[in-house]
Structures are given as C-alpha cells and as structure tokens.
Regions:
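Aromatic-residue-lined binding/catalytic grooves and analogous aromatic/hydrophobic interfacial grooves
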Residues: 1-248
Length: 248
C-alpha cells in the first residue's frame, strides 16, 4: 500500500525520488530502498510443514491449491521526507514536466512575467545523492524560494496504517542544512523498534544567503519537535539542493 502520489521519478537503485513538478509549490518525496515500515502484527514464522505433502501432490497432479496464510507480518515500503519548494505564484504558460532519458533528469519548465524557469533533478549513482538545480530565468531574474518539510499527516493515504505511530522532528540551520528524522513505532517484537530513518538536505545558494524560517507547530501527535523550521533563499543566481536518505 504505497504512501506516495503519482509524479516524475528518479533513482539510482538505492536512493529514489518522486517529484510533483508543480511550478510554484513543488514536492520532492525522498525514498530509500531499505525503508520498510513496521506494523503491530506478530513477527512469527508460520508453521506450514503439514501442508507440504498436499502442495507437492497438487503440483504433481497439476491441481490447484490455496495459501490461506494472511501476509499480515510483512513490512511495507514507506517514503522518507517530503520537501516542499515554494515560490511566489504568478500567471504562467508553457508548463511542461519532462524526463530526459539521456541525462537521467526529471524537471519542470514554465514561463511567467519574469521569464522562462527550469528546475531539474537527478540522482547520482557515483555520489549516492539526489541533486535539484533551480536556475535564474532566461531574463536573468534571480531565484527566491522557501524550503520546508511537509508534515507526515499531509502525506498521501496517511492514517491507513502504522505510520500514525511514527514520531519525528525537523531541524534547519543558517548553514543550509535541513534534516527530517523519524523514529519507527516501538512495537513489541519488531526488529526496528529502536530504529528510524532520516532525510538530510543541503541547500547551496549562489549569490545569496540562506536564512532560517519558523513555521507553526504541526497539530498532530506524531510531531516530537519543539519548533518547525525551514530555510529561505532570496535573489540567488542558482540554488542546489543535495539530499540523501538513510536508516538510523
């Protein structure tokens, strides 16, 4: 049961990304192939030894057989952090989302009264990170954008599973680092009850400073932080977002 909406995808086999490609409120959903979400079901191996002979005979006789064991003990994949990039909304035209199969990039291109804008993302195999580039417009208008992590409760299909028992925090500093760190549910018998996951984003702003912002605390029991910070870039020539996700 996926927790991610449709979008453009990028990845290198371990690090993965889904981006919505919206012009002024884009979302970048970071993933890692090792992210699996525990559930509260018993972690026991089913005893199926007494079914072996009947299954063998069914195969030999080309008959049918039914597996009545429910797979409730299987852990499912889950997303990492969901980064939101906000820019001032304007009337726009020429909107296009694209995948460049030669460069392995996904991106969005559109035009407003400040010119044509291009935002592109790819996941590096050599470096094991995802990189997003936001360049100034073709009219040389600079980049102004705000970066925040979305709350878990806003994720697609939230509330249908054990994600309601995750606890998480957000961090950001003036050096350009943003971190989303979460603790898995502490279910009895779970191999991951002491573990969690994190997504770290490093924002590089050419020609402008990075400043911290403060947003209202999330109104949800999952949030364990004392603040809800983000970062803002104003009038930059180019902005890079370098991101990586992993288990903790």
């Amino acid at each position: 049961r996926p927790l991610c909406p449709d979008g453009l995808v990028s990845g290198n086999g371990e690090q993965r990304l889904i981006t919505s490609g919206a012009p002024y409120s884009d979302t970048l959903i970071y993933q890692n192939i090792h992210f699996i979400l525990p559930n509260a079901n018993p972690r026991v191996t089913p005893d199926t030894a007494d079914e072996l002979e009947s299954v063998r005979q069914a195969i030999i006789k080309k008959g049918s057989y039914t597996d009545s064991q429910p797979y409730l003990d299987v852990y499912g994949y889950h997303p990492g952090a969901q980064l939101r990039i906000r820019q001032e909304e304007r009337e726009y035209s020429g909107f296009m989302r694209y995948t460049n199969y030669e460069t392995a990039e996904v991106g969005v291109r559109y035009t407003d009264d400040k010119g044509q804008w291009d935002r592109r993302t790819f996941t590096s195999w050599a470096d094991g990170v995802t990189i997003t580039q936001i360049t100034s417009s073709d009219k040389e208008k600079p980049v102004t954008a705000e970066f925040t992590f979305d709350n878990i409760s806003s994720f697609a299909k939230f509330g249908d599973g054990s994600e309601v028992d995750i606890r998480y925090k957000k961090y950001a500093d003036k050096d350009g680092y943003m971190t989303f760190v979460a603790h898995y549910p502490s279910y009895e018998g779970s191999e991951l009850k002491e573990g969690g996951y994190a997504t770290v984003c490093y924002i590089i702003s050419e020609g402008a400073d990075v400043k911290t912002t403060e947003n209202g605390l999330p109104d949800e029991k999952q949030y364990a932080g004392s603040s809800n910070p983000g970062l803002k870039v104003k009038k930059a020539d180019t902005v890079y977002v370098i991101s990586v996700s992993g288990r903790t």
